[in-house]
Amino acid sequence: MASAEGVRDLLGLLAYAELVAFFRLSEDAALAPSLSDKAALGGMAVAEFGHFQLLRDEIARMGVPPEQAMLPFVGPLDDFHARTTPSDWLEGLVKAYVGDGIAADFYRAIAELLDPPTRQLVLDVLADTGHADFVTSRVRAAIDADPAVAGRLALWARRLVGEALAQAHRVAAERAPLARLLAGAVSSPDGPGGEQGEIGRMFARLTDAHDERMAALGLAGWERVPEAEAPGPG
């Protein structure tokens, strides 16, 4: 069973991530090219804030001030977003899809170790708000209209994966209770490399789902194609 400290760290991390997602989607909504897109993203932002409120309330129920639980993760998450500022609306959409997808896989793996009510809370918070379908349809439409953007977006997605995993390693290295929880989600910490070795293997497996997301976006196979030379797939 997960330790109380590990659960607190997980919920604090997820709560701050949901709060940041609310801010990010609100910004994306302001940049959206049409009123319907603005409204759709605005609705998704509201859903993310609702997720944050659920987590905040659960942390408070545990007897921990929510701000105290979130504070250790402000630096790593803010650093990730500072290092991956999108240059346009499409890059913002890809960032949300790729980054949120890796994070969701990460949280779902850990949720298996939680008590049933907390596990269900995490899964409810991770439920798709319609953002995945929204992003894939817009990115695919943009590629159909201008195939040259595919190479740029694919390289951007690859960079996002590297940055996301680097910050996840940082969090695991700095927060021992969370590191033990992560190690328990994949194997025994007695294996080669101890807890950090198990965590590294977990992160390696998380990249497998990235290939599926790239295919869903229509970006599979584009990472090595310079934008100026990209005539279109096939």
List where the protein language model places each region.
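Helix-loop segments that flank and shape redox-cofactor active sites
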Residues: A21-G42, T84, D100-P117
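Alpha-helical scaffold segments that form or flank carboxylate-/histidine-based iron centers
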Residues: E5-L13, L35-G50, W89-L93, P117-H131, ...
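Conserved alpha-helical segments that form or flank metal/cofactor-binding pockets of metalloenzymes
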Residues: M44-L71, S137-V139
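Extended alpha-helical coiled-coil scaffold domains characteristic of the BAR superfamily
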Residues: L93-A103, H210-R213
